[in-house]
């Protein structure tokens, strides 16, 4: 019986699952938004949110524990130097999962996973007046 067994198997053995979660969490922290299937996104939340909570208290022990989970020095550095301080006042709920349709090949439900307070890229909008002024000169 499967009673009280939490987590999805996702058609993978335990080592493959662990490596997939590690890679997805590292990509999420590196890029601050990723696109994946909906079940993977929901499971990623169980892996990534405790790491951000751990990063809120910067210590050597917590950095080592995070490195043990992620195995990427660059990502661990960003986690503790940028993301931990950013979410210092937030008591949880660091990720947002947005459904984004279905994958064309197999119709799997897809989702965007993003960090809640991530800075959005600034798009430079040029005014038409500035362009006209530049053309007349």
Swiss-Prot record:
Any Pfam family the entry gives: Ribosomal_L17
What keywords is this UniProt entry annotated with? Ribonucleoprotein, Ribosomal protein
Q: Subunit structure, per the record?
A: Part of the 50S ribosomal subunit. Contacts protein L32.
Output this protein's name.
Large ribosomal subunit protein bL17
Q: Which PANTHER family match?
A: LARGE RIBOSOMAL SUBUNIT PROTEIN BL17M, RIBOSOMAL PROTEIN L17
Gene (UniProt): rplQ
| SUPFAM superfamilies with a match to the protein in the record | Prokaryotic ribosomal protein L17 (SSF64263)
Q: Which GO terms describe its molecular function?
A: structural constituent of ribosome
Q: Which cysteines link up through disulfide bonds?
A: none
Any one GO cellular component localisation term in the record: cytosolic large ribosomal subunit
């Amino acid at each position: 019986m499967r009673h009280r067994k939490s987590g999805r198997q996702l058609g993978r053995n335990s080592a493959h699952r662990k490596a997939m979660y590690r890679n997805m969490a590292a990509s999420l922290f590196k890029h601050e938004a990723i696109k994946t299937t909906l079940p993977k996104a929901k499971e990623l939340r169980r892996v990534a949110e405790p790491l951000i909570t751990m990063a809120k208290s910067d210590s050597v022990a917590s950095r080592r524990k995070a490195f043990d989970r992620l195995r990427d020095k660059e990502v661990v550095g960003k986690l503790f130097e940028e993301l931990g301080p950013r979410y210092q006042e937030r008591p949880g709920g660091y990720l947002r999962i947005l459904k984004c349709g279905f994958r064309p090949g197999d119709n799997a439900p897809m989702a965007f996973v993003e960090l809640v307070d991530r800075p959005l890229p600034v798009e430079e909008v040029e005014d038409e007046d500035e362009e006209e002024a530049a053309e007349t000169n």
